[in-house]
């Protein structure tokens, strides 16, 4: 995997008249594993949406390999895997069909044998043919997380990936994240849980809180 570099420069986020955070700088390079921390409402999800290009910052820039992401969107999206709060799966399709669909549209490894291996890893063997809409919220979350094992993307942006996942699942995912960064990837995530990794760097959004109210003009 080539060396990559994500830069957040003087980012500020505003929701209505409230400024959630300001003057946030972050350099994440190949091999970095970053956890965004902060209390509810501080703007963790908003920050991730800015990083992936789904929202715009009140000020500041996001760069991928020194180029602003809005000027290099196709290459950036090719290198990006984003998993948000919602599972983002098709409920009418089975777990197997959802993963096959993702293989077709994403930057993914193509292997039927790999699909079986992933279904076993996420505990869905025996349920692979059931419509995803008939599965529990935790099982639907596992379908979404299964994309991680398929993805060739360098940059993983994950919003609360451990929600509805048991302790064993947390350990399995953490090992996967560590393997990804060891291979030159970048992982940025939010989580309220303690993550069992000594590779983790933590960023507290509270440090960038803007206490006065007003516009960023």
From Swiss-Prot:
SUPFAM superfamilies: P-loop containing nucleoside triphosphate hydrolases. Gene3D superfamilies: P-loop containing nucleotide triphosphate hydrolases (3.40.50.300). GO terms for biological process: cytochrome complex assembly. GO terms for molecular function: ABC-type heme transporter activity; ATP binding; ATP hydrolysis activity. It is a peripheral membrane protein. It catalyses: heme b(in) + ATP + H2O = heme b(out) + ADP + phosphate + H(+). It is found in: Cell inner membrane. Its main location: membrane. This is Cytochrome c biogenesis ATP-binding export protein CcmA. It comes from Histophilus somni (strain 129Pt) (Haemophilus somnus). The gene is ccmA.
């Amino acid at each position: 995997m080539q060396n990559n570099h994500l830069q957040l420069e003087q980012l500020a986020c505003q929701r209505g008249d409230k400024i959630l955070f300001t003057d946030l700088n972050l350099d994440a390079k190949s091999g970095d594993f970053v956890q965004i921390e902060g209390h509810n409402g501080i703007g963790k999800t908003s920050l991730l949406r800015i990083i992936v290009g789904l929202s715009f910052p009140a000020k500041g820039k996001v760069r991928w390999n020194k180029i602003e992401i809005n000027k290099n969107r196709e290459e950036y999206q090719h290198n990006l895997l984003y998993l948000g709060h919602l599972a983002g799966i098709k409920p009418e399709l089975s777990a197997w069909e959802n993963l096959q669909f993702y293989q077709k549209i994403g930057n993914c490894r193509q292997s039927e044998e790999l699909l079986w291996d992933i279904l076993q890893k996420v505990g869905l063997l025996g349920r692979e043919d059931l419509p995803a809409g008939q599965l529990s919220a935790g099982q639907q979350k596992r379908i979404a997380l299964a994309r991680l094992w398929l993805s060739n993307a360098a940059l993983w942006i994950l919003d609360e990936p451990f929600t509805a996942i048991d302790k064993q699942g947390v350990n399995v995912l953490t090992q996967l994240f560590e393997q990804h960064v060891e291979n030159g990837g970048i992982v940025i995530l939010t989580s309220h849980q303690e993550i069992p990794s000594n590779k983790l760097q933590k960023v507290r959004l509270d440090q960038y809180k803007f206490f006065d109210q007003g516009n960023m003009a």
